[in-house]
């Protein structure tokens, strides 16, 4: 959703011609409805964006947009264990257990109650551990 939102909000900056900008009008709402329909039908929904360059800063807005349509726990699962399941890496990724690859983060608050915390990682994530090594520590 965040990639579509960037295209609809910043398409002109991206160099999209007027005809393309017209085509994307309403696309965000259409995609929201698709996510909602999939959620209601218990379709596995992975989590991720393809935002690069100047627009990379908007990628974590996906948490906010998805939480408007799904429960916070389902959005978090989508970003972790569901993604692992989709790429057939259950037990290796998306979980915290011995011999699993995991990024562990320390969040200033409870994303189950306020998922918006994850939309601003620079402000709300004070520690990141990757492969057993701390790669960010602002404690």
Q: For each predicted feature, which ranges?
A:
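His/Asp/Glu-enriched, well-ordered alpha-helical/loop segment
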Residues: 15-19, 26-111
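Short, Lys/Arg- and Gly-enriched loop/turn segments at beta-strand edges
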Residues: 111-117
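Active-site gating loops and adjacent loop-to-helix segments of metal-dependent hydrolytic enzymes
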Residues: 1-26
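Phosphate/diphosphate-binding loops
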Residues: 125
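Short aromatic-centered micro-motifs
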Residues: 128
């Amino acid at each position: 959703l965040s990639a579509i939102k960037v295209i609809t909000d910043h398409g002109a900056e991206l160099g999209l011609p007027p005809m393309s900008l017209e085509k994307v009008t309403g696309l965000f709402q259409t995609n929201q409805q698709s996510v909602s329909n999939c959620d209601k039908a218990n379709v596995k929904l992975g989590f991720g964006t393809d935002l690069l360059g100047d627009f990379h800063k908007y990628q974590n807005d996906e948490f906010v947009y998805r939480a408007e349509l799904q429960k916070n726990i389902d959005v978090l699962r989508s970003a972790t264990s569901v993604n692992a399941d989709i790429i057939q890496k259950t037990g290796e990724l998306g979980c915290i257990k011995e011999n699993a690859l995991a990024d562990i983060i320390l969040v200033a608050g409870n994303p189950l109650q306020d998922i918006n915390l994850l939309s601003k990682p620079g402000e709300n994530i004070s520690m990141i551990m990757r492969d057993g090594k701390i790669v960010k520590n602002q404690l």
